[in-house]
């Protein structure tokens, strides 16, 4: 009787342990599955966010191109027989009506840009001229103007005559922080934000204005400063990728998650970044490591 009772207890203990183990395993799998679902949801949200921001900015850039192309179709600009000073006067009047524009300028097909006071500037080596004279719309990364040392962005479009021959280039200079202003209100998590990188990795728009003014390049900085190595990898991955995606990176003691997408109008890269802890705290951090 004692043996049977002992055997019975042993069996109860064994089955109890098996049931407990099964319950724990099921619980762990459920937690892991839940974590994975949360991570996937956040990744999808961030990719969609980056894509949406890129599309909105493309819309604003293209709207400005349309505005510039409208001016480029003015008869006085298309007619090569109209004196250059008359063209300049016309563009000055248009500039006065638009607070966003700092300068509208006419450049002939030979690369001579005509300015106020019968001044002429050779711009045939400028990227914006070389693209527009081939029939392409172009927008520059922010740069320091040689005229007044201010930070500007230049939009350029070709000017066609009535026979659809390119007879010149119209340029529109705007504030170099215009793009930064466009993404200023984008917030992800609590402190996350958006920024834009140019084709070679220079900061085109960033909440830190100095990055834009000084053309901060995370990839180049990462070669000299090890604290930027992870940032440099993020920037390189984002710039050379053609599809939106999500990556993890770290800077000093902060682990962040970032999504990126391309702007079709310029080829620049939108990156949205925020500390991982701002999404799901310890649970999110653990999930990403699992």
Please report, for each region that a protein language model flagged, where it lies by residue.
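Juxtamembrane extracytoplasmic/periplasmic/luminal helical "stalk" adjacent to the first N-terminal
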Residues: 5-83, 93-100
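Extracytoplasmic/periplasmic sensor domains and loops in membrane signaling proteins
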Residues: 82, 88-91, 116-145, 210-248
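Intrinsic low-complexity, intrinsically disordered coil/linker regions enriched in small/polar
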Residues: 162, 178-270, 279-280
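Extracytoplasmic/periplasmic ligand-binding sensor regions of membrane-associated signaling proteins
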Residues: 95-103, 107-186, 190-193, 248-250
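Cytoplasm-proximal transmembrane signaling helix
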Residues: 12-20, 32, 269-271, 276-290
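Short hydrophobic beta-strand segments that form the core of ligand-binding sensory/regulatory domains
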Residues: 154, 169-171, 262, 269-273
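Amphipathic coiled-coil signal-relay and dimerization helices
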Residues: 71, 107-119, 201-207, 259-260
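Output-coupling edge of small sensory domains
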Residues: 143, 157, 261-263, 277
């Amino acid at each position: 009787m004692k043996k049977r009772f002992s055997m019975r207890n042993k069996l109860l203990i064994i089955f109890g342990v098996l049931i407990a183990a099964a319950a724990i395993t099921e619980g762990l799998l459920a937690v892991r599955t839940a974590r994975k679902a949360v991570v996937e949801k956040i990744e999808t949200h961030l990719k969609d966010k980056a894509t949406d921001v890129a599309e909105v900015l493309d819309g604003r850039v293209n709207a400005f191109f349309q505005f510039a192309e409208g001016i480029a179709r003015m008869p006085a600009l298309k007619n090569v027989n109209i004196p250059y000073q008359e063209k300049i006067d016309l563009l000055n009047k248009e500039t006065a009506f638009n607070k966003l524009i700092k300068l509208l300028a006419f450049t002939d097909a030979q690369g001579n840009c005509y300015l106020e006071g019968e001044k002429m500037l050779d711009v045939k080596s400028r990227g914006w001229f070389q693209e527009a004279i081939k029939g392409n719309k172009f927008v520059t990364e922010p740069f320091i103007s040689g005229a007044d040392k201010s930070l500007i962005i230049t939009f350029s479009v070709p000017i066609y005559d009535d026979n659809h021959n390119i007879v010149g280039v119209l340029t529109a200079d705007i504030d170099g922080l215009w793009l930064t202003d466009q993404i200023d209100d984008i917030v992800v998590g609590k402190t996350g934000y958006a920024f834009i990188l140019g084709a070679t990795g220079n900061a085109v728009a960033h909440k830190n204005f100095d990055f834009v003014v000084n053309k901060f390049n995370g990839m180049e900085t990462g070669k000299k400063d090890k604290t930027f190595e992870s940032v440099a990898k993020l920037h390189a991955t984002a710039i050379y990728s053609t599809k939106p995606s999500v990556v993890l990176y770290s800077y000093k003691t902060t682990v962040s998650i970032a999504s990126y997408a391309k702007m079709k109008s310029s080829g620049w890269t939108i990156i949205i970044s925020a500390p991982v802890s701002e999404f799901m705290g310890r649970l999110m951090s653990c999930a990403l490591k699992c």
